[in-house]
Amino acid sequence: MKISIFGKYGPYPPLNGATSSYVLNSKQTTVAFEFGSGAFSRVNNSFPVEKSDALILSHFHFDHCSDCGVLGYALLRYYALGKAKEPLKIYCPKDNSPLSQAIKSMKAFSVTEVGDGDEITVKDLKFKFYAVNHPVPCLGFRVTDGEKTFAYGGDSNECAALDKIIGGADLALLDGGLLYRDWNENKPHLSVKGCSQLAKKHGVKAIITHLNPEYDKGEIIDEIAVGGGDCVVAEENKTYTV
């Protein structure tokens, strides 16, 4: 499996950046997950969206799904042109917010709500979802192609579910939305240090994403070192092998 990062920032992007948007590829399958600000043009340039097998949304905050609207518009046009034949499958948590309803109501999408402990299969990929610690319903997941396992923590502060998601994975993508100086247990995100410590605890290689654009990259790298984990800072428009 391979994971491509098209947006690594949150809760908003810097100039020429994008918020959370990723694509997971296996031998048979292309699954996008998260589709934040700037996602459509970047993802569609590398992986035509009409050929994607599914889109997973961890939760309904704008920095994770804001480009779903233009994605829906594009798919409707592609249907009219014959470039796409079926609605794009979206897997997401149950949420009745106005934002979620706006996305779920678009005719371009076929939406399936999933929850804690649910499992789905998309061609050769098997996913298991876990509820994580965020102010709105939010899911992380583990996915395997039968050989390797990739873990995504979603947006989350510390919680037991992250241990279940990350333990034994070959590669993890973790929310390092805060530097430790700005973090406490009531915040909506992990610190970079906390991500690094979590990776060390489980002996897992990790990519730190959901980075605040106001933070200095050097500070982020220093905090990874303090945590002691085998971690790298996410780079946009880069592909990593699981």
Language-model-derived ranges and their functions:
Residues 1-46, 113-164, 236-242:
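Core dinuclear metal-dependent hydrolase active-site scaffold
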Residues 32-36, 53-63, 92-93, 150-156, ...:
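Active-site neighborhood of phospho(di)ester-bond hydrolases with catalytic His/Asp-centered motifs
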Residues 71-89, 137, 144, 184-207, ...:
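P-loop/Walker A phosphate-binding loop and immediately adjacent motor/lid segment at beta-alpha junctions
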Residues 88-94, 113:
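Extended hydrophobic secondary-structure segments that form protein cores and membrane-embedded regions
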Residues 159-239:
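Cap/insert and terminal regions of metallo-dependent hydrolase folds
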